[in-house]
């Protein structure tokens, strides 16, 4: 929004969306809310079709359920994969189809994770989902390049968001994380804004 784009924010909870959109419009930016759930593929596809044309799609939806690999429940596995992989894949597909149909160049940016390239204790399912995001992103980049559509990922380390709130409520865990990060601090959303804006 700060770069001058009209931003359409999509999430499941209207109350959260309204707060985000209000913050942007109060700052003089152009934004609107769209209630939806990436896990609902048909509804997401219809929503994307309704807001065409699109120039940039940033997929930042994510879910994490941590457990030892030997204790992962099938329901937890399915829930994480449904959002992080299935939802991301088919939303990217819908956006790509719309861009191709409209004859527009564009950019699809998937927010992945450092966990896409490293492992983590109690994070086997999350890591698997992000490895998969890296895989389909690379393939889509090759396939969609001829249509002038770029497809990339941004792979940050721990970023302070509602998704990581539980982790950061544990001081010992925060200390361990910060010792692993060369900057000596946990990342903030603002730290990845430049990369996203560049790729857009």
Label for each model-derived stretch:
Residues 14-15, 35-46, 74, 191:
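The beta1-alpha1 cofactor-binding region of Rossmann-like NAD(H)/NADP(H)-dependent oxidoreductases
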Residues 68-69, 76-78, 177:
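Substrate-binding pocket helix/loop in short-chain dehydrogenase/reductase
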Residues 70, 118-124, 146-147, 184:
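Active-site loop immediately N-terminal to the catalytic Tyr-X3-Lys motif
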Residues 92, 129, 137:
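Active-site helix of classical SDR
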Residues 97, 142-146:
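Alpha-helical segment proximal to the catalytic Tyr-Lys
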Residues 113:
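Residue(s) in the substrate-gating loop at a strand-loop-helix junction
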Residues 153, 175-200:
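C-terminal helical subdomain
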């Amino acid at each position: 929004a700060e770069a001058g784009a009209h931003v359409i924010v999509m999430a499941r909870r209207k109350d959260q969306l309204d707060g985000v959109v209000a913050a942007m419009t109060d700052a003089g930016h152009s934004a609107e809310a769209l209630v939806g759930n990436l896990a609902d593929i048909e509804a997401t596809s219809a929503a994307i079709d309704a807001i065409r044309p699109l120039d940039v799609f940033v997929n930042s939806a994510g879910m994490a359920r941590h457990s030892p690999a030997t204790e992962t429940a099938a329901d937890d596995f399915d829930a994480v994969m449904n959002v992080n992989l299935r939802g991301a894949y088919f939303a990217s597909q819908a956006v790509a189809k719309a861009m191709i149909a409209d004859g527009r160049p564009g950019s699809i940016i998937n927010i992945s994770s450092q966990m896409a390239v490293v492992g983590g204790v109690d994070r086997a399912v999350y890591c698997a989902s992000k490895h998969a995001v890296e895989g389909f992103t690379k393939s889509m980049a090759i396939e969609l390049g001829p249509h002038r559509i770029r497809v990339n990922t941004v792979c940050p380390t721990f970023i302070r968001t509602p998704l990581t709130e539980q982790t950061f409520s544990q001081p010992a865990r925060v200390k361990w994380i910060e010792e692993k990060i060369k900057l000596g601090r946990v990342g903030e959303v603002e730290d990845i804004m430049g990369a996203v804006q560049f790729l857009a």
